[in-house]
Amino acid sequence: VPFHSVETYLARLIKLGESVALCEQVGDVATAKGPVERKVVRVVTPGTLTDTELLSDKSEAILLAVHQAGKNRCGLAWLSVTQGVVHLAECAQDELADWIDRIAPSELLASAGMTPTFEQKLRGLKTAGRGSWSFALRPDFQFDAGLGQRKLLEQLQAASLAAWSADALSDAHAAAAALLTYAEHTQGRSLPHVQRVQVQRSDALIDLPASTRRNLELTQTLRGESASDSPTLFALLDTCMTGMGSRLLKSWLLSPPRDRQVAQQRLQAQAVLRGDSGSGAWSSLREQLKGASDVERITARTALRQVRPRELVALRHALARAGALSVQLQALNPEPGTLLGGMARWLTPPKHCAELLHMALLEEPSALVRDGGVIADGLDAELDELRGIQTNCDAFLLDLETREKERTGIANLRVQFNKVHGFYIEVTQGQLDKVPDDYRRRQTLKNAERFITPELKTFEDKALSAQE
């Protein structure tokens, strides 16, 4: 399909639950003999979406891997590629339906070697309307506990999983192996931003059976409606100013913790923000957040080298907002260890990051890197030189033509360019006896000869590289 309309086709196919391979030209046109080399650079699937155009602001694309273990047990590992957190859990097979309801995956991975009974159970859950996830079978050898543990340690850059209380979850490790292998395969690269692991245990969460979730209409009505204007608890509570906030609220509703201290911390933070009069700092903070960019998704796309220039500009503005938000929260003098205290610290922008983005990018860059017009002047001397050559090409050719006419005495000499033969100096047949020794023949025509000089060849190399 045409590259400029690929997003439209992707959206239609992903909505149907299909996976799409993106193939790009990787060979050099100038040196290629025959068709230019192409390769699959990325596979877009329902559970590994990172494109803003394909994702709802208030929903996550979650990839879940399920490992059928012995003794009627299951290992679970799931990930939102834009969040960068691997979640691990283990459960009994008869609890699997509740876990899938809680996780709400967009895509589910399972082993091609699972038993027919277990496969029937998984497919039955989907048929029964327990989610709209797509189903993908992976080779059995990918569900290897040892491989999963090694991959998790590589992501965390750690020697042990004990610090995350994840060292003894061999069934979940097997699921994590398939999960990370599949995620890396679809993105066409490693996942450097995946640097956290979170273990979820059923006894740490409030037990909400699937029937209870449906009747409470947490995120979906009994009729199956889940739009933002549907009469669900999430739609009622969601007054968040950003998509990041809405997604966090939804995860809190789907996985409410038993720990009373967590609820108390959230209530304390709410009380501080509203103040005694009910009109505290929260209103100014909400105003500051209005129109904020989706930093979570932009940073993930940056790590995956999929980010677009205008997203980096949005990130630049978001970092400025984050700094202002941090100052506002610190002005409330939150106690260390509290939720607000942690938020004030986390919102402090990385040193020099915003400064680099301001210095490196134009105020209004092109939509795509290949279109040029992204990097600001003054950042790179070589780029400035190439950009100057591209801008002043006509002036250089006119100047060279004037100088060569004076040097050779050929009054009708012309310096020109075409896409087939590049830059050249054209001399008519009647003036060939005046051609200097440093002219090298490039093309012979019926009534003229075309030449190139060392100076023009050097300019040609720079001009063509400037276009690239």
Please provide the spans of the model-predicted regions.
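Extended, charged coiled-coil "arm/hinge" scaffolds of SMC/Rad50-like chromosome-maintenance ATPases
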Residues: 445, 449-468
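Short, surface-exposed charged micro-motifs
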Residues: 65, 412-416, 424
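Short, charged amphipathic alpha-helical segments flanked by flexible coils
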Residues: 263-270, 431, 435-449
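Active-site proximal loops enriched in glycine and acidic residues that flank catalytic Cys/His/Asp
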Residues: 112, 417, 428-429
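Charged catalytic and DNA/RNA-contacting regions of genome-maintenance
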Residues: 1-274, 278, 283, 287-303, ...
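Cytosolic, long alpha-helical scaffolding segments
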Residues: 354, 360, 424-439
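Flexible, glycine/threonine-enriched loop-and-boundary segments that flank and lead into catalytic domains
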Residues: 395-415
